[in-house]
């Protein structure tokens, strides 16, 4: 119900991905330049249904009251390098987070349990030793809506039926090849991920360019009166981004459900136990095809 707007990384920054070195513990090691090349290669194009300022991505900043806000005049996607176990090997994970100023109330509603200040979407790419995608997955920055998008290089494991929340795979995605980029189709307002597509580098040239920035900078945001502070509190949450849903979901054991939170604080299941940064998560769900 808005206008489709594409955001993309700078053109000409997705050259060949360097082979990583591996330390004695089997952990892939990258120089700063190698990590930057890997993030540039797999940075997604965002295709957002823009119906208001709340649908524009931007940089997290502090306002005059020291509250965290989004500056949509500076489109930024934040990055983090993580790791996971899969098929007996440690694989790099490229984590991209983009922020919106709010999730507005649903049109016509007087009470929307999910609405509130700030909203974020996290997109993660798990790659093999050659830097090629194995699995994509996504959550919102509160930890909700965990979706998996496997490529043809992995197969889902047969798991016993339990009451725990199971693997949710809305679609499979072909591994992006040279000259291709993943496109994330994002709904207006809710910022739900609706579809994952592929586009060529040439077709993404008309996108508004965003900048990639290390997510660790969010722990030292500049204050208007001088000095810095973290976007997150000591509890790992962003103050002011609470949701009314927390009063309904507290019996499920998730503290302040719906509130935006820091890496390491993303529980992704209300039934059972599942955390976004669990290093054994992918090995439990997938096998690598040989």
Task: Give residue ranges: language-model regions.
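Short N-terminal edge-element motif at the start of the domain
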Residues: 54-136
